[in-house]
Amino acid sequence: MTDDFYCDEALSGRTKVTVVMETEDVLAFEHTRPFWPVHIVVVPKRHVPSLVDLGEASEDLLYRVIEVVRQVAAEVEREHGACRVLTNLGRYQDSKHPHFHVCSGPLTSPGPGAMADRNQSTSRREGP
């Protein structure tokens, strides 16, 4: 097992996911442990470690991923009135595979990246 949930579990079929949209190169599915009432994850089917590497690996693939993010986000916004599109890099990125979260509604369960952000925000408010 690697630190890539998407290749190891979601894309391999080992973990069942509810598909929202799929193209030849991109999969969008409902998050298996959602942090928001609406929480969809968009991933390229080809493995690359992060968003930074995705651009270097293939600008066309990056465009195709963003196009699916755009379509999913438009649908979520239409249905729910608003949405967020989020991604994480570095230590905030739990799974070393580029992925975008398309979310709507109040945060119901903070993930590791959310906790890191909250801790940084708190320390900034407290001052040096």
What are these regions (language model features)?
Residues 1-128:
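HIT superfamily nucleotide-processing domains
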